[in-house]
Amino acid sequence: MSNVIFSQNLYDTAQNIVDGCMGDADPACQTACPMHTDVKGYVKMAGEGDYKGALHLIRERLFLPQTLGRICAHPCEANCRRNTEFNQPISVAGIKRFVAEQADEDANWDLKVGSDTGKKVAIVGAGPAGAQAAIELRRQGHQVVIFEKLDVYGGMMRVGIPEYRLPRDVIDFEYSYLDMLGVETRFGVEIGKDIAFQALRDEYDAVVLAHGAHVGSIIPLPGHKATGVFSAVEYLKEVSETRDFPRAGKRVMVIGGGDVAMDCARSSWRIGADEVYQCSLESMENLPASQVEIDESLEEGVVFNAGWGPVSIEDKDGAVTAVTLKKVESIFDEEGNFSPKYAEETRVIEVDTVLFATGQIVADITDGAVDQTRGGRYVVDKETLASSVEGVYVAGDASGGNIVIEAMALGRKAAISIERQFAGKALTADRDFRQEYSYESRLDIPLPKGTVDVPRLHGELRDAEERKRDFKQVDFGFSAEQVKAESSRCLKCECKLCMKECIMMNDFGDCPKTLFKDFIETKDMDPKLAYSCNACDQCTVVCPKDYPMKDIFIGARPDFVKANGGESPMSGHKAIKMHQLLGFSKFFTMAKSAVNK
């Protein structure tokens, strides 16, 4: 009935619901993922055995499902409700890996690209950021050329993550998508050395700087120039390429508490170390490394000195002999500034090799054309990733990304900006930046009734003493039975509690937000919606925000009656001349004759 004039009060109530309803809110696992992968969707499909369907959802966002299933820092898991409530998140990465191993075939990859636009884009670096930018731009029909100084795909992911965690054939298989899509990659070409940065600007319509942080950082402690001191970057790169590091000794100290430090420590066993130690300012409880990496390092025999900071490197005749540690009392001062304080208690650990896993920086390949911060990142607009140089964008490590999934999202963000540049659009106008990176979910609902803690499952690992002496893959991954069981732990987080209680609203919309948004925009309502409500109020009872949906439905009925000449718009309504309230009078009540039996 398009001739109904509804009261403003109904519109106001509806608008309040539209503004706050969480029915369309994505779960925290999805919003925490910088690529916004539909975690809940593919976990459900995997649990049902629909591996192809699950993989389809994954590959809509991620071209590296097997890789990420092994090495992703999985912010989705950190924000999983089972983690925030029980400290045991769903093993999202493990499920992703299994699905990809079971169902991913290059014959099924989406190779559609747009018509040739005549635009050319140069991308520096074939890591996750550069690759993602290349994929997004190539799909739009642009000619894309990647310049990679290494001879292989993967960037820092390839030379910084040991192969016992990430087999190289996995990288090669998943990166072959770029070749099939028509992206050109020129290996062994270093921008700033083999080709000048300005030459790229002159030849290409846009440039993406996506080269990783390949420069290691060594803290200038007393003795840091002694023979036997190396950066983690140098060490892991050579070990990755050769499975060896001849300059290292047999007793290794790794300085640092992150995943890179764990990789250095565990790699040291695999190239022949007899003793491997770790030290860091952070205590064992506050190490930045993932718990999996810490646990597996401990299993392999790494000796931790967490909470003990290095104060000097001892040497004899210029070669490392030991590292002196002091007990850490605090790392930051009262203002939150980095200012370590030590107790007098010391430890001296005899070693012949020291590895600094204390950070790395991005080399400037622009000859100063693009400003860099003191931390070795390029200065860019954080939302658009545009640099101060027109047509030049930055992604990945070079713009501040810290993990692979973030690098991919930044590569996509740079591609979005370039697409706008090519279309002549402003880089920021009418752009929903929230959809381009991680954000906090609006979903705030109670746990489903009867929810209990269910232990998280883990893949089978090789024996620690066996695995620590070779580079074969450590984690065998999940079985089909484990995937089914682990998927069943998902709480399927969503609101829509009212939709589960109401017997009629599902016939008219997906959730109150979409239902009432349509009402506000069209200024119209299906009378069946208003007259189907039986005023049970269960929608409001279960609503986390106590929204009065019933008030709108019941409140709309007088407006329908008024527009219909004083009669109900519903055929079949009959008068019941009794003492009921108005809400149950002839205008609002359906009546049917008794069925003769």
Language model segments and positions:
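Iron-sulfur-cluster electron-transfer modules
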Residues: 27-31, 40-221, 509-597
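Internal hydrophobic alpha-helix adjacent to the cofactor/substrate pocket in enzyme cavities
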Residues: 264-279, 405-430
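Mid-to-C-terminal Rossmann-like scaffold of FAD/NAD(P)H-dependent oxidoreductases
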Residues: 9-11, 20, 295-301, 309-319, ...
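Short beta-strand "acidic-cap" motif of Rossmann-like dinucleotide-binding folds
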Residues: 142-148, 273-280
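FAD-site-proximal beta/loop scaffold in flavoenzymes
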Residues: 225-250, 333-402, 409, 416
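N-terminal glycine-rich dinucleotide-binding loop that anchors FAD/FMN and/or NAD(P) in oxidoreductases
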Residues: 90, 161-185, 224-232, 289-315, ...
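Glycine-rich dinucleotide-binding loop and its adjacent helix/turn
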Residues: 99-115, 173-193, 216-271, 373-388
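Conserved beta-strand-loop-beta-strand element in the redox core of flavoprotein oxidoreductases
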Residues: 189-205, 315-346
